[in-house]
Amino acid sequence: MTEISAKYEQLIEDLRRDYRPQREWGEGRGVFLVIGHFLVGVAAGAWLFGIIFNYVPGLVAGFLLAGGGGIAHLAFLGRPERFWRMVRHVRTAWISRGFVGLTLFLVGGVLYLPPLVLTGWPWAADSMLGYLGWGMAAFGMVVLIVYMGFVYTASKGIPFWNSPLHPVLYMAYALRGGIAALLVTMAVFNAPSVDATSLVTIWIAVTAVVIVLFALEIQGALTGGNPAARRSVREMLAGRMAVYFYGGTLLIGLVVPLALLSGHIAPLSVGILAAIGLFSALGDFFMKYTTIRAGIYLPLRPRQGRHVE
């Protein structure tokens, strides 16, 4: 009862505010949703680049990360045993579409991966079952890359999320996370067969795109005329989320990888590239965490004679 009472008191306190923060996603059990979205995005990106570079360890990493993301989603649900009911809303809900995409991705991976990593498997990767698995995983991968940003833009009550750039930004995060996963995988599996120069070049390009998109989204929130969106930006840049943004997103996710990439700290090696990938992925997690936690609801009722920036 203590926990319920605390949540009730917090809700009452929030309702008294003109601009109340969303707490369902990112606090308490809601952290599992952030983790789940982060993991499946990285998983889809890892699978994409694993296919492009014909790198089986990258495919394995993508499959394992997707499984972890699925577990995190189940941990978020109040009644995990009812997860299958989400498929009923696939026509109207992006979360349901994401569930379908994750299911197809995992089932496809089960069909396609084993003959690539195990000898004597009953079917080959280039058999009918193998091609079916490849197609299912590829379709699920596309859904996972695309759907996450739309989950947030569909939340009309939180203007900061309701940006046309948000889905594109999440797609870019999936690509950046996928490259990071491959950089880490090369060290973990001791299989540096991927062209590291190409991976790093793509990572730099995608990182530049992420920076531009994020700056445009912040600029749009500040100049769009919606005080709730401006309050969200303030929460992230100078409020309760600032330490996660500056310490996690900028320092861990951008400054440290670029410093390592410069070669001034240590010569580039498989281990340094893995560190770049790890810090990059952590920065992406903090970015998603801060933007989700910074969400501010529209006021329940207008206040006359007051203007809150």
Name every feature range the model reports, one short phrase each:
Residues 30-31, 35-39, 89-93, 101-286:
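Long, contiguous internal "core" modules enriched in hydrophobic/ aromatic residues
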Residues 1-56, 60-63, 294:
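N-terminal signal-anchor module of multipass membrane proteins
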